[in-house]
């Protein structure tokens, strides 16, 4: 297995190096051929590596940074200022060819703007898209994009999203002929706005896509489609709503045992089974959204990700680099006029 190097924005997210460093240590134990750049506050990073074995430490390279981009900072300000931020410096390592991927739990808008500014975009790509895996009723996950970085876009952009998402599902998700659908308010051809109707025409004519038509919100997790395409506003609302529903169900199941003696007894029997099933819906194991359309791998972790969730994000970067995803996406886009 060839050596692989990833750059981590060690300071990003709600918990910064207290999550990113332990996660990175565990990942190095699992992937013996992996090396990691840790970009951030050198003193903080070193303090968290004190009890790490020499063999693991030798595969870390610390790159000191001077700034951290606040989570609520406007993307334009992140671009103009914060030249020595951990996020920007981690992305620069990818641009310079020193790392094959960057992983950050920092400000999503800043990551998008800086990635596009520093790395540019692939030929035939107008704008990168944010894609993530979601659980389904089958054994296969669902890939959904865009999830928020393109709140408005045209039909040509949705075609690009579809091609990139299909390449991801095929080469990283190991789905031979991914089924691609457009998220809409109905399945009939007459349903939807002009955007999705025009996009449907483009997707149906593209020979690189296995386009199956429209899909409704209630079927996102059904497994009927492998790749679901929409604008970023729609995708983000759908994603956050589904996460909220999972939290609500788990909260209700946790509190139901306090009602009376019957529900207490029933919960002792049933709740462990239900909670076990619901664990596969928790976002931790699906952490790690990808910015597709760049000449390098950039992974966005949830800002509130804990250690295990951040490990999933790093693993997603490893899988995408190993699959040669960037080249596969470039090949899939070559057919666009």
Swiss-Prot record:
The keyword DNA repair does not apply. It comes from the Bacteria. GO terms for molecular function: phosphate:acyl-[acyl carrier protein] acyltransferase activity. Keywords: Cytoplasm, Lipid biosynthesis, Lipid metabolism, Phospholipid biosynthesis, Phospholipid metabolism, Transferase. It is an enzyme of class 2 (transferase). Its EC number is 2.3.1.274. Pathway: Lipid metabolism; phospholipid metabolism. The keyword Lipid biosynthesis applies. It catalyses: a fatty acyl-[ACP] + phosphate = an acyl phosphate + holo-[ACP]. GO terms for cellular component: cytoplasm. One of its GO terms (biological process) is phospholipid biosynthetic process. It is found in: Cytoplasm. It holds the Pfam family FA_synthesis. Belongs to the PlsX family. PANTHER family: FATTY ACID/PHOSPHOLIPID SYNTHESIS PROTEIN PLSX, PHOSPHATE ACYLTRANSFERASE. NCBIfam families: plsX. Catalyzes the reversible formation of acyl-phosphate (acyl-PO(4)) from acyl-[acyl-carrier-protein] (acyl-ACP). This enzyme utilizes acyl-ACP as fatty acyl donor, but not acyl-CoA. Homodimer. Probably interacts with PlsY. HAMAP family: PlsX. This is Phosphate acyltransferase. It comes from Moritella marina (Vibrio marinus).
């Amino acid at each position: 297995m060839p050596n692989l190097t990833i750059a981590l924005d060690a300071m990003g997210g709600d918990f910064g190096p207290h999550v990113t460093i332990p996660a990175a240590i565990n990942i190095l134990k699992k992937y013996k051929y992996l090396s990691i750049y840790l970009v951030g506050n050198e003193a903080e990073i070193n303090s968290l590596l004190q009890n790490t074995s020499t063999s693991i430490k030798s595969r870390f390279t610390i790159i000191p940074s001077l700034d951290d981009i606040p989570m609520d900072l406007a993307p334009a300000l992140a671009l103009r200022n914060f030249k020595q931020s951990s996020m920007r410096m981690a992305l620069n390592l990818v641009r310079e060819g020193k790392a094959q991927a960057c992983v950050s739990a920092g400000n999503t808008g800043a990551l998008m703007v800086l990635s596009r500014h520093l790395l540019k975009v692939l030929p035939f790509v107008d704008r990168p898209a944010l894609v993530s895996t979601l659980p389904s009723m089958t054994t296969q996950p669902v890939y959904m994009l865009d999830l928020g970085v393109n709140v408005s876009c045209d039909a040509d952009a949705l075609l690009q999203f579809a091609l990139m998402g299909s390449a991801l599902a095929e080469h990283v998700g190991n789905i031979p002929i991914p089924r691609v659908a457009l998220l809409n308010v109905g399945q009939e051809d007459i349903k939807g706005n002009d955007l999705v109707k025009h996009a449907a025409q483009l997707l149906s004519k593209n020979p690189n896509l296995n386009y199956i038509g429209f899909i409704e919100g209630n079927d996102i997790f059904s497994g009927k489609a492998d790749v679901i395409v929409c604008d970023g506003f729609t995708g983000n609302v759908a994603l956050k709503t589904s996460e909220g529903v999972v939290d609500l169900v788990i909260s209700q199941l946790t509190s139901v045992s306090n009602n009376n003696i019957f529900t207490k007894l029933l919960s002792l029997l049933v709740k462990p089974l239900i909670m076990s099933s619901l664990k596969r819906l928790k976002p931790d194991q699906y952490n790690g959204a990808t910015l597709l359309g760049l000449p390098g791998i950039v992974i966005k972790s949830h800002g509130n990700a804990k250690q295990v969730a951040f490990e999933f994000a790093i693993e997603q970067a490893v899988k995408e680099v190993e699959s040669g995803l960037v080249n596969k996406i470039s090949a899939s886009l070559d057919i666009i006029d």
